[in-house]
Amino acid sequence: MERAVKENHKPSNVKIFHPMTEGAKRIPVNQPQSTQFRPPGTAVSAQRILGPSNVPQRVLAQAQKPILSSQKPTTQIPLRPATQGHQSSKPQGPNENRNPQQTSHSSTPNVEKKGSTDQGKTSAVPKEEGKKKQWCLEDFEIGRPLGKGKFGNVYLARERESKFILALKVLFKSQLEKAGVEHQLRREVEIQSHLRHPNILRLYGYFHDASRVYLILDYAPGGELFRELQKCTRFDDQRSAMYIKQLAEALLYCHSKKVIHRDIKPENLLLGSNGELKIADFGWSVHAPSSRRTTLCGTLDYLPPEMIEGRMHDETVDLWSLGVLCYEFLVGKPPFETDTHQETYRRISKVEFQYPPYVSEEARDLVSKLLKHNPNHRLPLKGVLEHPWIIKNSQLKKKDEPLPGAQ
């Protein structure tokens, strides 16, 4: 693989902060879906799957080794109908801010046009951002692997023209089809590419060739928050509150856009160059303008009672996950984690958990207000941001002092 990369891409003097190495993962609770590709926006019927055979566990992910080539996109489109193009926003130019971590929803990269645009057709970015660009692998210099997953790998990359540093996620079509998760990929692209927030990883666009799909992503040099939590065992109140505050602000933005994440967990959170938290995985997210859903998804330890019981759910599932995450930050493990799936389900349904003695009363108050069996009784996100424990512990340090986790 390395030889193929070297032959097709010139080496570059890219300063690399720290690799996003492979670590233990939780397996998401999957839903059986048809392997037939559907156009974006096509409704997918909700299904409830509940059983020990597909519940998540922390395991070592399998390494995949794609052989990258400079093959241009073909007309076999994995995510969209054949009449639509693969267009996306262009990373910033050399005279602009090249640090991906400083991108926010109020400051978007420049874009340029290559060829004609598809009038009246959707693309990977909002139309208001201006002109679009069609990408191919030859537009990038590929660096070292940043991470490995079930369906492909993530590489450090640099856009040749602008010298913009980014992450290139390479997914194999055959594996996506075999697992029946094409709908998740389409959903991730459609949702994440339209979100602009400093605590949400930017998805600039995508392209594909005969066998692979490529996602152009922000580069988060801090790596997975899960790895950082493993290294530290648990976080103190200040660091935990800072992350919960950032995540609450990002979720508040998502909910304002009618987006429910449904799979908040440390493995889906990355750390930017300044140590800021970034939501990175929207594979289980849904855009539900006015509907409630019954689909079982996400990670077992983070599932709320209404989802494991097969009841209707809405954006309040993210409030439950926020409470579970806050507990795991402070304790080092999820509150309902047990040796068996059945016992974990039972404890979630009963909201049965205990606090270690070192967890402060203010932190317990916040977690307890989020982990309510009745979704309507959970503390809303604005209440989270106004909670005394958050206000007391999430104050930013001096401007010249990096946040925890900054590389």
Swiss-Prot record:
The active site is at 263 (proton acceptor). Residues 1-10 have a biased composition (Basic and acidic residues). Residues 67-77, 84-110 have a biased composition (Polar residues). Its main location: cytoplasm. It comes from the Eukaryota. One of its GO terms (biological process) is mitotic spindle organization. Residues 1-130 are annotated as: Disordered. Highly expressed in ovary and testis. It is found in: Cytoplasm, Cytoskeleton, Spindle; Cytoplasm, Cytoskeleton, Microtubule organizing center, Centrosome. Residues 287-300 are annotated as: Activation segment. SUPFAM superfamilies: Protein kinase-like (PK-like) (SSF56112). InterPro entries: Aur-like (IPR030616), AURKA (IPR030611), Kinase-like_dom_sf (IPR011009), Prot_kinase_dom (IPR000719), Protein_kinase_ATP_BS (IPR017441), Ser/Thr_kinase_AS (IPR008271). Pfam families: Pkinase (PF00069). Keywords: ATP-binding, Cell cycle, Cell division, Cytoplasm, Cytoskeleton, Kinase, Microtubule, Mitosis, Nucleotide-binding, Phosphoprotein, Serine/threonine-protein kinase, Transferase. ATP binds at residues 150, 169, 217-220, 281. GO terms for cellular component: centrosome; chromosome passenger complex; cytoplasm; kinetochore; nucleus; spindle microtubule; spindle midzone; spindle pole. One of its GO terms (molecular function) is microtubule binding. Belongs to the protein kinase superfamily. Ser/Thr protein kinase family. Aurora subfamily. Interacts with kif2c and kif11. This is Aurora kinase A-A. It comes from Xenopus laevis (African clawed frog). The gene is aurka-a.
